[in-house]
Amino acid sequence: VRYLFSVEKGRLLNEYQLIYISRGDGQFVSASHKETSFEGGGKFILLFPGEWHSYRPSPKTGWHEYWIGFTGPDIDRKVGAKFLDPHRPLFNVGYHEDIINLYKLALRTAQEQGSGFQQILAGIVNLLLGFAYNICWN
């Protein structure tokens, strides 16, 4: 997977990624979503496999970014059921330490690769998606 990219050219990934911008301003655009600017952080960006996208922080503010990549039948079912949709890749959730702590736990879990680490990571992804959906639509 090639994670580095040119903002002008964008990129395609072969996995989903859930990005949390905890603080800062920036822009996002994808094949299914028009260019959108946002301020103040507290945003999830969900990237879809095989879909062109580009995003960047504002040069004036920068941003704090956390991300996790994933694939599998569970997420494919959620997308197939329209629970998650490439036309709605942004989730305005605000700033939450709990979300940041889940990303930090995912990083430690991936680095340590202890018994059951993939199941733990899958659980963390489901929790993060649950936060996105719950906070946005309640």
Where are the model-predicted features located?
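Amphipathic alpha-helical segments enriched in hydrophobic/aromatic residues interleaved with Lys/Arg
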Residues: K78-N138
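N-terminal regulatory/effector-sensing and dimerization cores
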Residues: V1-P86
